[in-house]
């Protein structure tokens, strides 16, 4: 079972990614496969919650450029701007994901 929480009250340094914009874009583009809060309910679609922003940014840019290929992700990433990628990566990185053993106390 997974629990996801967003750290509220975090401020962004000047020029940093816009987490709010990232949430909006991710909801529109990514949530169908990767879940509304980055926890996938789809087989073969990885969880994105709590992944490091630098990792997500690099992978999305690799899909966009063709350096990395996937039937769906290459098409999804192609029109994304650097700013949109940074924003979505920051959104997913801002999420926390706690993984519990099956049957563990809640």
What do the PLM-derived regions correspond to, one by one?
Residues 17-37, 49-51, 101-106:
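Sequence/structural segment immediately N-terminal to covalent heme-attachment motifs in c-type
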Residues 26, 63, 91-92:
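Conserved hydrophobic/aromatic "anchor" residues
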Residues 3-4, 14:
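Cleavable N-terminal signal peptides
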Residues 68, 78-103:
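C-terminal capping alpha-helices of c-type cytochrome domains
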Residues 23, 38-68, 74-79:
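Gly/Gly-Pro-rich "capping" loops immediately C-terminal to redox-active cysteine motifs
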Residues 9-13:
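N-terminal signal peptide c-region/cleavage motif recognized by signal peptidases
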């Amino acid at each position: 079972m997974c629990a996801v929480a967003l750290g509220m009250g975090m401020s962004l340094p000047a020029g940093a990614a816009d987490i709010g914009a990232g949430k909006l874009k991710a909801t529109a583009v990514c949530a169908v496969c990767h879940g509304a809060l980055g926890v996938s309910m789809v087989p073969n679609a990885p969880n994105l919650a709590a992944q490091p922003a630098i990792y997500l940014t690099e992978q999305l840019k690799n899909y966009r450029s063709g350096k990395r290929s996937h039937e769906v992700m290459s098409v999804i990433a192609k029109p994304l701007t650097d700013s949109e990628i940074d924003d979505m990566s920051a959104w997913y990185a801002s999420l926390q994901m706690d993984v519990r053993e099956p049957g563990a106390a809640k």
